[in-house]
A protein has these predicted regions:
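Glycine-rich phosphate-binding loops of nucleotide-dependent enzymes
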Residues: 1-226
Length: 226
């Protein structure tokens, strides 16, 4: 799925966040582990790598709930994303300018403490901070959570733009199925930790079961997907 936007869909408790944390190797920090199967990144098994090693390989996760450093300014938050880079100040400054190009709101608020910015600006900051690591793949956990609809659309538009222009791969976990399928190339629907359906975004959007259970377009009485 390199160079694409892939959505993990499903309700609360479906296993979306756990899947992301398994990929980024943050699961071990919560005393979890992958007990079956393999996780491969360009042919390399990554289950035993540390989160820092994953970042070095270009995989960065944006956690649910934004998690900006409240006492730091927006720009200071962004620069923490470049902590592991070794390519010099000029390259980091160029990356910062690129982030500001994609997120002009952040340029305007660059000197503001993150605690005093809006939820949308904090989400943009969290994504921008991930981009400062020069990732090949970004894992986004519930990017729409707690945001006004117009801000959600703005965030997804930027994600799509980054994907198309910078060729960054996005794996996102999202409960807003309608929005996710509008911008994703393909998706997987999870229930109780299992994949119950997969396909292109167009295929999933037109599927009658998906319409009923996840897009709110059905009138059936069934209580589970399968």
């Amino acid at each position: 799925h390199e160079g694409r936007i892939v959505a993990l869909l499903g309700g609360n408790g479906a296993g979306k966040t756990t899947t992301l944390r398994a990929v980024s190797n943050l699961l071990e920090g919560e005393r979890g582990e992958v007990t079956k199967g393999q996780i491969l990144l360009q042919g390399e098994r990554i289950e035993k790598l540390s989160p820092a090693q994953m970042v070095q390989r270009g995989v960065v996760q944006v956690m649910e709930g934004r998690h900006c450093f409240a006492h730091l300014t927006i720009e200071e938050n962004l620069l923490t994303g470049a902590f592991s880079r070794k390519d010099g100040k000029a390259a980091i400054k160029a990356s910062l300018e690129k982030v500001y190009t994609y997120f002009p709101r952040l340029r305007t608020r660059r000197s503001s403490q993150a605690a005093y910015t809006s939820g949308g600006e904090q989400q943009m900051c969290a994504i921008g901070r991930a981009l400062m690591a020069n990732p090949r793949m970004v894992l986004l956990d519930e990017p729409s959570m707690g945001l006004a609809p117009q801000i959600v659309e703005e965030v997804f538009e930027i994600v799509k733009d980054l994907n198309q222009r910078e060729k960054v791969t996005f794996l996102l976990a999202e409960q807003n199925t309608t929005m996710a399928l509008r911008y994703a190339d393909e998706g997987y629907i999870l229930e109780n930790g299992r994949v119950v359906m997969e396909g292109t975004a167009a295929e999933l959007s037109s599927n009658e079961d998906v319409k009923e259970f996840y897009l709110g377009m059905g009138g059936g009485d069934r209580k589970s997907f399968r």
